[in-house]
């Protein structure tokens, strides 16, 4: 259904566009086309005048004037060129005549001179002496020097000669440095040495900047407890002369925290042989000094952890720490602390057996027996050679009629020895022969402890003997009869 129309007219919002244009610009009118064309022509002429265009009459006058001026200039140039030609012609004829006369006179004079000198000898040309500047001569000798490097055959100074000259110069510098080394070592002896194994009078030869930098690092390490280590300290293991550099940092005054971090750093980055040097020169000395200087003769916790970390390389620990500690005469306190570290850390069986064989051959001492007991208590499957060494070690303390075993027969044996003997009987009673068992029972009877001796005897009797196998018989078992 359509919408109903409204009678009310809507009010417009604004006037129509046509009314707005009329109000702003006036009434719109039609423009005549002729007037529009005239206006365009006028505008075009005005634009031409502004751009500098001229009409045809003016341009013809300008071209005529330019042509007249050009003709006048060409006429003047032509007249001048003709005058020059006439002058040159007169000059050349005069000069040719004069030159002919001069040549005749010179020939006559030269002939007279030759006739005058003919009786006396040949004619010699006089040499001209030229003075050379000193700077030019020095520069010439620098590039073309006459010496051993100068190739006299070819008369040149080539690249090979320069290379040989530089090689000889380098060799001379090396010889000079070798001559100066004794003097440098004498100057460095005043810096002292650490008790880490440097011989008396031995010093380090390092650049002054390096010594200054690592002296500053050493002053930082005195009070270092946590955080990151200086980068200069971390790069020491990668240096070839790390022992000289670490000596400058004064390891005796490192804090215990630094000893632990340094042990981890050096043992993990150096080879076993180089790690042995670090453990022996620094860690062992700090271990002994700390126990000796402490009031209760205990070891600092961080140094204890450092000793534990040094077992990361067992061969370096045994050769650089344990063996020197025993050989230099450690006390039972030091052996007990070091042994507790050894008891807590797993050691490869081969390293353990080799260390045990080495300790069994040393003269008797209670600290050595402490380490023997700890290694036996690890329950490793020892080689028969090491087991035999253990048997001979305990057998040598029995009393012999001829007294061939010396002081070992009369020595008062400590309790730790009996404990080590009991440990061996418990762990390896099935790895000994019957003859060895009899000798050990005799030792227990003569030198046995009142409480520990019966236990050792019971363990030895409970074990089974190791059967001795002849190598030839073992090979016979593997033979096959092919007939």
Curated annotation (Swiss-Prot):
**Alphabetic keyword roster:** Cytoplasm, Nucleus, Phosphoprotein, Ribosome biogenesis
**Would you kindly state one Gene Ontology biological process term found in this protein's UniProt entry?**
maturation of SSU-rRNA
Q: Where is the composition biased (Acidic residues)?
A: 96-123, 174-183
Molecular functions per Gene Ontology = snoRNA binding
According to the UniProt entry, which residues carry Phosphoserine?
Answer: 172, 190, 404
Transmembrane stretches in the record are: none
**Chief subcellular site?**
cytoplasm
InterPro entries the record matches:
Bystin
Segments of this protein annotated with the region Disordered: 1-21, 33-55, 67-123, 171-200
Q: Which PANTHER family match?
A: BYSTIN
Q: What else is known?
A: Present with 21600 molecules/cell in log phase SD medium.
Instruction: State the family it belongs to.
Output: Belongs to the bystin family.
- Report the protein's function: Required for normal export of the pre-40S particles from the nucleus to the cytoplasm. Its subcellular location and association with pre-40S subunit shifts from mixed cytoplasm/nucleus to all nuclear in RPS19 disruptions, suggesting it acts after the ribosomal protein.
Q: What is this protein called?
A: Essential nuclear protein 1
